[in-house]
C-alpha cells in the first residue's frame, strides 16, 4: 500500500494487469493550539478538554506541566485502546472519555502528532495538538503558570 495525501492508494494485481484503486476518506483535522491557548487551559481548567503529555515518565519527572495527564506514546502506544478497568490498573487514573477533547503535547511536538493519530484510531474524534509542546512552554515562561482558583 502506498500512502497518498487524499487517502490510501492500493495496488491490486490481477492476471491481466495491475489496477490502482484510490480510496478516499475524510476526517476532521485536529485543532492546533498556541502557547496562549494552552496557558489559558492550564490557568482555567476545562472539564471538556484534557491536556495529555505523551512523553515518557522519566521525562515527565524532569518537568510536569500543571493539569496534564501522562500517557506515554512510545512505551504504551495502545493505551487508549485498553478497556477502562485495565487502563486504570496501568495508569492509576480513569481512561479519558471519548466526549472530551484530548490535546496532545510532548517535548517538541513530534510524538504529540503520533499520539493524536493513534487516539483517532481508537475512536477519539475530538483531538488537538500543541506543536510547541514543552520546549515552547518553558521558553515562553510556562513554568510559572499555575491553575487559578
Curated annotation (Swiss-Prot):
Q: Which reaction does it catalyse?
A: thiosulfate + hydrogen cyanide = thiocyanate + sulfite + 2 H(+)
Q: Where in this chain does the record put each Rhodanese domain?
A: 45-146
Q: Where is the transit peptide?
A: 1-25
The record's SMART domains line, in alphabetical order, gives: RHOD (SM00450)
Q: Name one GO cellular component term.
A: mitochondrion
InterPro entries found in the cross-reference section: Rhodanese-like_dom, Rhodanese-like_dom_sf
Q: Which Gene3D superfamilies match?
A: Rhodanese-like domain
Q: What is the reported phenotype of gene knockout?
A: Increases frequency of mitochondrial genome loss.
What Gene Ontology molecular-function terms does this entry list? thiosulfate-cyanide sulfurtransferase activity
Name the residues annotated as catalytic in the UniProt entry: 106
Query: Its Enzyme Commission number?
Result: 2.8.1.1
Pfam families assigned: Rhodanese
GO terms classed as biological process: sulfur compound metabolic process
**UniProt keyword terms in alphabetical order:** Mitochondrion, Transferase, Transit peptide
Which CDD domains does the record cross-reference, listed alphabetically? RHOD_HSP67B2 (cd01519)
According to its UniProt record, where is this protein located? Mitochondrion
The protein's matches in PANTHER family, at most eight in alphabetical order, are given as:
THIOSULFATE SULFURTRANSFERASE RDL2, MITOCHONDRIAL-RELATED, THIOSULFATE SULFURTRANSFERASE_RHODANESE-LIKE DOMAIN-CONTAINING PROTEIN 3
Q: What does this protein do?
A: Thiosulfate sulfurtransferase which catalyzes the transfer of sulfane sulfur from thiosulfate to cyanide.
**What other facts are recorded?**
Present with 4220 molecules/cell in log phase SD medium.
Q: What is this protein called?
A: Thiosulfate sulfurtransferase RDL2, mitochondrial
Q: What is the lineage of its organism?
A: Eukaryota, Fungi, Dikarya, Ascomycota, Saccharomycotina
Amino acid at each position: 500500500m502506498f500512502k497518498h495525501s487524499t487517502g490510501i492508494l492500493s495496488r491490486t494485481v490481477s492476471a491481466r494487469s495491475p489496477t490502482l484503486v484510490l480510496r478516499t476518506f475524510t476526517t476532521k483535522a485536529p485543532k492546533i493550539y498556541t502557547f496562549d491557548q494552552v496557558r489559558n487551559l492550564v490557568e482555567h481548567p476545562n472539564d471538556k478538554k484534557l491536556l495529555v503529555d505523551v512523553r515518557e515518565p522519566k521525562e515527565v519527572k524532569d518537568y510536569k506541566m500543571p493539569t496534564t495527564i501522562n500517557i506515554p506514546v512510545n512505551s504504551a502506544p495502545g493505551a487508549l485502546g485498553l478497556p477502562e478497568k485495565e487502563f486504570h490498573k496501568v495508569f492509576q487514573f480513569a481512561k479519558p472519555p471519548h466526549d472530551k477533547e484530548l490535546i496532545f503535547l510532548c517535548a517538541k511536538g513530534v510524538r504529540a502528532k503520533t499520539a493524536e493519530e493513534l487516539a483517532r484510531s481508537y475512536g477519539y474524534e475530538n483531538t488537538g495538538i500543541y506543536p510547541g509542546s514543552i520546549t515552547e512552554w518553558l521558553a515562553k515562561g510556562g513554568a510559572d503558570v499555575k491553575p487559578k482558583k
